[in-house]
Swiss-Prot record:
Keywords: Cell membrane, Disulfide bond, Glycoprotein, Immunoglobulin domain, Membrane, Phosphoprotein, Repeat, Signal, Synapse, Transmembrane, Transmembrane helix. Glycans are attached at N55, N62, N75, N100, N117, N189, N196, N214, N219. Disulfide bonds join C88-C144, C180-C238. It comes from the Eukaryota. It holds the Pfam family I-set. Residues 67-160, 159-254 form the Ig-like domain. This is Embigin.
Length: 328
């Protein structure tokens, strides 16, 4: 009540109607949208983009070409939106004033805009291309062509994810941990995938308690696979998401059964048994060969005795002298 009384005291009776008109004119109509009102409450798209990318850092990269080095490449890693300035420099003994300069993104020719700047000073040519990388569409391969034989290429990509290069070998019933990391970078998030034979399937730890996903630091991720079965072996992928794109790494998991580690021992046992059998056969053959000469000697002795006996009988038979037929 006191507040209304005070208001009436401040407003003169003759000004009451004027005040009501002013209030009605300045009151926003919520039923009907006012374009001017929306323009007042939100920035235009261009101003919003300018404000969003005003604080981006400028990164400069240079490739130097010579008559000896006519083709050169450079890899650029970008984690977040940035302003880029790519520069190709060519120094030659010949005149470079008549040399034509073009830029391409992948295989598409880039149109000449304010971002291009080519300067020729004596025997040196400088060509710059400045632009803003704010999404994955600006990533790729940028090349400067100086004439027909000189080329400098900038490969712009997101940070690379590193995992285990060799297959990870484990056994049925065990648990294992697959790890991926990104050096000197901070991904927005990590996602794990496994192969179902034909495609990559996201791993959801909330649905399948066989998996656990964690990491001690933001630039790494770990996938724990529990109670391994042979069918759990196969291909796994870790994927890191960045503001400018994604990067993934492939990890091979091999799950062996209990018989697999026993196979080498069984093979050794089989080899030992075979070796022992060969040794025994050799011993039997050698022993038999030793016995065979004795039997031969006995046979020879018997034959010799028979021969001697026959000779003795022949010697005991009386011999008769032959006489001439005339004497008879």
């Amino acid at each position: 009540m006191r507040s209304h009384t005070g208001l009436r005291a401040l407003v003169a009776p003759g000004c009451s109607l004027l005040l009501l008109y002013l209030l009605a004119a300045t009151r926003p109509d919520r039923a009907v949208g006012d374009p001017a009102d929306s323009a007042f409450t939100s920035l235009p798209v261009r101003e919003e983009m300018m404000a969003k990318y005003a604080n981006l850092s400028l990164e400069t990269y240079n490739i130097s070409l010579t008559e000896q080095t006519r083709v050169s490449e450079q890899n650029i890693t970008l984690e977040r939106p940035s302003h880029l300035e790519l520069e190709c420099t060519f120094t030659a003994t010949e005149d470079v004033m008549s040399m034509n300069v073009t830029w391409k993104k992948d295989d598409a020719l880039l149109e000449t805009t304010d971002g291009f700047n080519t300067t020729k000073m004596g025997d040196t040519l400088y060509s710059q291309y400045r632009f803003t990388v704010f999404n994955s569409k600006q990533m790729g391969k940028y090349s400067c062509f100086l004439g027909e034989e000189l080329r400098g290429t900038f490969n712009i990509r997101v940070p690379k994810v590193h995992g285990k290069n060799k297959p990870l070998i484990t056994y049925v019933g065990d648990s294992t941990v697959l790890k991926c990391e990104c050096q000197n970078c901070l991904p927005l998030n990590w996602t794990w995938y496994m192969s179902n034979g034909t495609a990559q399937v996201p791993i959801d730890v909330h649905v399948n308690d066989k998996f656990d996903i964690n990491g001690s630091y933001a630039n790494e991720t770990k996938l724990k696979v529990k109670h391994l079965l042979e069918e759990d072996g196969g291909s796994y992928w870790c994927r890191a998401a960045f503001p400018l794109g994604e990067s993934e790494e492939h990890i091979k998991l091999v799950v062996l059964s209990f018989m697999v580690p026993l196979k080498p021992f069984l093979a050794i046992i089989a080899e030992v048994i075979l070796l022992v059998a060969i040794i025994l056969l050799c011993e039997v053959y050698t022993q038999k060969k030793k016995n065979d000469p004795d039997d031969g000697k006995e046979f020879e002795q018997i034959e010799q005795l028979k021969s001697d006996d026959s000779n003795g009988i022949e010697n005991n038979v009386p011999r008769y002298r032959k006489t001439d037929s005339g004497d008879q």
